[in-house]
Structures are given as C-alpha cells and as structure tokens.
Amino acid sequence: MASYKGLIVDVNGRSHENNLAHRTREIDRERLIVRRGQPFSITLQCSDSLPPKHHLELVLHLGKRDEVVIKVQKEHGARDKWWFNQQGAQDEILLTLHSPANAVIGHYRLAVLVMSPDGHIVERADKISFHMLFNPWCRDDMVYLPDESKLQEYVMNEDGVIYMGTWDYIRSIPWNYGQFEDYVMDICFEVLDNSPAALKNSEMDIEHRSDPVYVGRTITAMVNSNGDRGVLTGRWEEPYTDGVAPYRWTGSVPILQQWSKAGVRPVKYGQCWVFAAVACTVLRCLGIPTRPITNFASAHDVDGNLSVDFLLNERLESLDSRQRSDSSWNFHCWVESWMSREDLPEGNDGWQVLDPTPQELSDGEFCCGPCPVAAIKEGNLGVKYDAPFVFAEVNADTIYWIVQKDGQRRKITEDHASVGKNISTKSVYGNHREDVTLHYKYPEGSQKEREVYKKAGRRVTEPSNEIAEQGRLQLSIKHAQPVFGTDFDVIVEVKNEGGRDAHAQLTMLAMAVTYNSLRRGECQRKTISVTVPAHKAHKEVMRLHYDDYVRCVSEHHLIRVKALLDAPGENGPIMTVANIPLSTPELLVQVPGKAVVWEPLTAYVSFTNPLPVPLKGGVFTLEGAGLLSATQIHVNGAVAPSGKVSVKLSFSPMRTGVRKLLVDFDSDRLKDVKGVTTVVVHKKYRSLITGLHTD
C-alpha cells in the first residue's frame, strides 16, 4: 500500500484476496505473495479519470540492482509473456496481471506508468512489490502435481516425520519444517542470492530461476556449507561443543534463522536428516512439491565400481585407513522433488532425487541431483545429474575381505541384496510409513532386476549360484529389540546342513558405531571353538551389559555385531553382520484444554529416566509451526535412576489449524529423546451486538 501525489493516489495490492486465491496466506497476510501462471489483481485509486488518449503501462523489475526488467504487455500474447488487462476508467482501476507458467520466481517491483499520447511518462507509481513462487496447481508449470492430497502434504504441510534406525528396526522422529513461519520465505530467497552463481552473475542467475531443476540443484548445494556460503556445516562425531549437536534439532526454522542473522555464516552442526529436512523446508516454501526419503542400508561407493568393499584383519578390525573409502550407512536421508525434466528424454519426469548432504563433488560443488527416480529404476545412468552415485546408494554389492598377515586378501562374504532396503517416506494419509523401494528398483531376484543391473554395468549373479555358494554351514545373528540402559543378549547361531559333524572357530565382535559406520569402540569380543553335529544347530550367547557399551556408544545408540566362522575343509570362512539399535523411551507431551489462537495455553512434558545412573544437564526443547518458536527449558539438578522429571511451558498459538508440538530432551548420558502431540487451534470468536464475529 502506497500513496502518491497526482493522478494515482493509492495502489492496493489486494494481498488478502490474492494470497487466499494463491494459497500463500499462511506465509503472510499483509505482503503480496503469488504463484506463477495464475492471475492476480491490484487496484489503482485515482484522483480523476485518465486524461484522453493517455494509457497505462506496467514494468517489472527483478534483482537488487534491477538486473532484469520486464515490460508487461497490454493484451494476451505468447504463453511465456506477462500481460495485463484493466477494468474501470474513473477514480478506481482494477488491473489484472497474468504471469507465464515459466515466470522467474523471486521478489518483483512493479512500476505503474501513466503514458502520454506521444509516449512520455506523465506519472510513475513504483512502490508496490510482490513475491512470485512456483505453482504446482498450474497445469503448465514444470512442478505441476495433479493430486490435491499430495499437494497438501508435499507443499502445504509444515510438519513431518523422518525415518531413522536400521532396515529391520525403523524408528521415526517428528520434524517441524515451518516453511510458512515468519520471514522463512525471505531467508529462502536469501539462500538463492548467496549461491556462487548468483554472486558471480546475478542477472544470469535470476533468469535461470524460472527452472525448478536449476533452483533445486542450487538449494542442494547451498544447504551444506562446503565451498560456499551454505547453511549447515556437517559433523559426524563428537564433540559438538562449539555448536548444536545434530540430534538436538527438531525443526528447520531455527537453523535458517541463525544462518541469516549471523550474516550467512554456516550453522553448526548437521547430519543427513538435518540437511534433508532443511532442503525440504526451502523447496516446499518456494512451491516445489518435496518429501524426505530415507534409504536404509545405504551405500557410499567412492570409486564408482558399484560395490562397497570392506577390508578387515583376522580380528575383524577395519584395515581401511583411506581418507575416502567405501562405506555403508545404516540409513541415509535425501529429498525427492516433483518436476518435469524438459532437459532430458521422455520418461524422466516426476520424482527427482536431491541430496544436500556433502558427500561427493558434482560439477565442482558438493551437491547431488536432481536425478530422476525413474532413471535409477531403469538403470539409465547417463542422465543428469549424478545417476551413477544414486544408483550405487540403492544397488551396490557389499563385499567383506579378510587381509591375512602375509597381505593376501580372502573374500569372505559377498551380498547382492543388502543395500537399499525399505526406502521410506511419510504417507500422505497420516503419520505412518510409506515404502517406496519399488520406485527405485525392481523386486530382488526378478528378471527385470537382472536386466537393469546388466544395463548399469553391475555384475549379474544368477539366483542358482547364490544357493550353491552358501555351503553346508550357515551363520546368523538374532537379538531382541534392546532398550538403552539395559543388559541384553545377542545369539549367534551356526547351522550345519551337511551330513557330518563340523568343527570351526567362531569369533564374535560387538562394537559401537555411528549411523554412518564410524567406529566408536569395542564393547566385547569372544572367540571359541565349536562343534556342530550334522543337521543340528549351535547357539552361542554374547551378553552385553550396560557398562560394556555405555563408555563407547555414540549418540545414535547403535551396536554392530560381527560373527566370523572359520571351518577347515569348508569353502572358506563365512561372516554375518547385524546392526542393533538401542531404543529410547518417548517423552509424554500433553496440552490439555481448548486451544484458541492468541490465547494462553500450557504444555506439560514428563519423562522417566530409564538408565541405572543419574542424568545431569538435562534440557528440553519445544517448538511447533504456528505454536511457538524453539524454546529451551533447563532441568535443575540431576534426574535419579527411575526418577521422573516434569516441566511445563505456557504459550499462545499464533495460527489456526492442526498443529504439532515437538519436544526434544538431551542430557549428559541420554540424548535424542523425542515426543510430539497434536494441537488443534481454533479461531477466536467474540460477541458483537450484531452477533458472532470471527477474527
């Protein structure tokens, strides 16, 4: 809203009705925010009618220094052009602007020019501005998604669930994306403005912002701070004392705010799910349908040979001292964004992998994607971007080698089906898990899978050979789902399927690791000789006590058990590996009473210490989109074993609708304890003489 002397008295951006029509009212009700490919209207208040033969012209400016100038046509022209029409000619003129579906996203400044018959500018009103976003509701937009329920989840939902753990023990954590929180949109454009391409040539960068492929790739590179002014610094092991430990974050908004307020200095620290969640926030805010993905048993194939090779000594200790070596992560998170790929052959539209975790350089930057999920499934590794790396993450072989004292290597196990399991995302229809593994690859062992492997250059093994190689001795690891703080048993079973007794040496090793396989210390080791009668099984129990693992367990509460069976006269040693996550209890979060916007409400959080030792330095962190910004409550004193701690916090909800309140608890000995509850915030009613009125 702005006032001018002369003919144009006032310009009204009609933000209330425009933002409602463009589904941007959650972002801001006062500033004008529109989506491309969809018309919007502004009103001119004039002191008089336009003089005879005078007319209006509209000019758009983009960039901090007006690097891009667009003249708006008076009548409907080409589909890729801006145009406007006007109604009324007295003291009020309604201007309706039509943007092309491939318009540049960004902050526009609009100048309204009153032109004389001879082409001179009589008056100029240029104080109105607006933001333009992608429009997944527009059929001609590259991000068009023709499913309203998916749009509500992948664009409009500010809360979500991210999956973690191991493929056979999947856990979830709540996350506050908060893409419509105050000034988050401004920070998202600030992220784009600080990319290397924008700093090098802002005009060219702005013009490319019409393309979601370009924007998605830019955001992927900018979410991590490797080599640029990116948002987050990654760190995968303690200490985190000069920043925030990755597991303590419960939402993206504090991260983005801290980055912006600190003068675009990177925030410490993130790991893969934090990188993915922040990218999801930015991309949803800009209007690109996006969802977080978790790939369990995710391969990091450094040398591109489609296999992950592990070198061990005879004590089962890793020998790979290379700075950059193959690894297998218990889980790895990235995002998928929905868009058409006009830069690629037909068949590559739809979900695209974007991975902001800094792992490998791509065109000189730490980014990955966008890579079509369809291309990964079909083994088309020549398409842009980074298809071989993504294909390996979900399809690589896993090979373990024993390096003997004389330097000779012995292959002890080769697994063609252990990577890329239970690929997961939150369902559109609730907080349960949707398995999308079959989006990435054909069923294990199918003919189609073997055809894809052959096309991608991965060695194909026929199923019959797999069975023949198993031999007469079989090795497996069994365990319950243990709770962190308790003692538990791991059972290693040796089965003898042959017709004679087997004599072997069994080595068992339990070690603490991080979720991305960094070793934190040995918990227990056991080597014994076993005799297994024909057609029988032998079970060996390794009991792990809390004192065995607490001194070295990581914040991910993960124990890796390896078992190696070496039987003279057999085909060779066999090995199996199990990753055992130690579960932690959830927080109890309650918000009693009716929630009404801008009226006080109290949240109650309680927690019982499950450990046999006191907890010191306890901190609760609460946040929720539309409810309250991230707030910490420190616990006074220690929490005794089996002791209960309770805290409460009063706040006033800021926005109506179904909201999530997220809580995290951390202490010296127990970290990453989460809780969540749903809060339905109602509109505020007040009684007037004429009846009821809704705020």
Curated annotation (Swiss-Prot):
Active site: 272, 332, 355
Activity modulation: Acyltransferase activity is regulated by the binding of GTP and Ca(2+): inactivated by GTP, which stabilizes its closed structure, thereby obstructing the accessibility of substrates to the active sites. In contrast, Ca(2+) acts as a cofactor by inducing conformational change to the active open form. In absence of Ca(2+), Mg(2+) may bind Ca(2+)-binding sites, promoting GTP-binding and subsequent inhibition of the acyltransferase activity.
Enzyme Commission numbers on file: 2.3.2.13, 3.4.-.-, 3.5.1.44, 2.3.1.-
Keyword Lyase: no
CC annotations in GO: chromatin; cytosol; extracellular region; mitochondrion; nucleus; plasma membrane
Keyword Metal-binding belongs to the record: yes
UniProt-recorded Gene Ontology molecular function terms: calcium ion binding; GTP binding; histone dopaminyltransferase activity; histone serotonyltransferase activity; peptidase activity; peptide histaminyltransferase activity; peptide noradrenalinyltransferase activity; protein-glutamine gamma-glutamyltransferase activity
Site annotation Important for catalytic activity: residues: 515
Function: Calcium-dependent acyltransferase that catalyzes the formation of covalent bonds between peptide-bound glutamine and various primary amines, such as gamma-amino group of peptide-bound lysine, or mono- and polyamines, thereby producing cross-linked or aminated proteins, respectively. Involved in many biological processes, such as bone development, angiogenesis, wound healing, cellular differentiation, chromatin modification and apoptosis.
Protein name, per record: Protein-glutamine gamma-glutamyltransferase 2
Organism: Pagrus major (Red sea bream)
